[in-house]
Amino acid sequence: MKVAVYCSASEMIRPEYFQDAEDLGTRLAVGGHELVYGGGNIGSMGKLASAAHRSGVKITSVIPKFFHDQELTFLESDEIILTEDMQQRRKLMWEKSDCAVALPGGFGTLEEVI
């Protein structure tokens, strides 16, 4: 199953939220799932992707070009899709996944899931 995960790119969140992201990244492998996410290499996104990558999960990063240009992309992803904007990112993540999970985050995470 392709699982879309929405989570924070901020480094200013509670440490246990980083652990939750790492745990989910590892558990995706146990279930034989793939990860579709926002493509970031920082915050919960980075923790999620790093753990998933270490566990052998196939990763699809969907990230706006303006974040990629700031070197915020998790480059170890199996597939990196650059979008023009956040709206296109949300649309593609929805289309490329079978289900969605939201981890704790701020207003950016909330905006992506509504």
Please place each PLM-identified region on the residue numbering.
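N-terminal glycine-rich "phosphate-gripper" loop used for MgATP/nucleotide binding
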Residues: 83-84, 105-107
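A cross-family phosphate/adenosyl-ligand binding-site feature
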Residues: 1-96, 113
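Hydrophobic acceptor-binding patch used for acceptor engagement in glycosyltransferases
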Residues: 100
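Short glycine-/small-residue-rich Rossmann-like dinucleotide-binding loops
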Residues: 8-9, 104-106
